[in-house]
């Protein structure tokens, strides 16, 4: 189980990403616009750097919804591989069964 503080930190990051997404997108379009002046592009770059570091979607980490485990995360289920296996063995995930050949 992950510490509660780590789970809370990820929730905080997710909120920041949503809050600053539009502002970040407009600044990035200005920076990548070849028709914009160099001064505009430079000022947009400086404004982008003043935004909170955790507002970048790259910093968000996928975690298991049950345990908070950061590794072995399966996007389709939103859980770690360990919890997916446990739920699968109990028959709680429809259509999933242990492989045998």
Swiss-Prot record:
Keywords: Ribonucleoprotein, Ribosomal protein, RNA-binding, rRNA-binding. GO terms for molecular function: rRNA binding; structural constituent of ribosome. It comes from the Bacteria. Part of the 30S ribosomal subunit. Contacts proteins S3 and S10. InterPro entries: Ribosomal_uS14, Ribosomal_uS14_bac/plastid, Ribosomal_uS14_CS. It holds the Pfam family Ribosomal_S14. GO terms for cellular component: cytoplasm; small ribosomal subunit. Binds 16S rRNA, required for the assembly of 30S particles and may also be responsible for determining the conformation of the 16S rRNA at the A site. Gene3D superfamilies: 1.10.287.1480. HAMAP family: Ribosomal_uS14_1. One of its GO terms (biological process) is translation. This is Small ribosomal subunit protein uS14. Belongs to the universal ribosomal protein uS14 family.
């Amino acid at each position: 189980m992950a510490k509660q503080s780590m789970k809370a930190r990820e929730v905080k990051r997710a909120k920041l990403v949503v809050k600053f997404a539009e502002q970040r997108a407009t600044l990035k379009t200005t920076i990548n616009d070849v028709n914009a002046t160099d001064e505009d592009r430079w000022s947009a770059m400086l404004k982008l750097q003043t935004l909170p570091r955790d507002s970048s979607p790259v910093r968000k980490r996928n975690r298991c919804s049950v345990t908070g485990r950061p590794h072995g995360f399966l996007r389709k289920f939103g859980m770690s591989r360990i919890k997916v296996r446990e739920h699968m063995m109990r028959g709680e995930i429809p259509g999933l069964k242990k492989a045998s050949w």
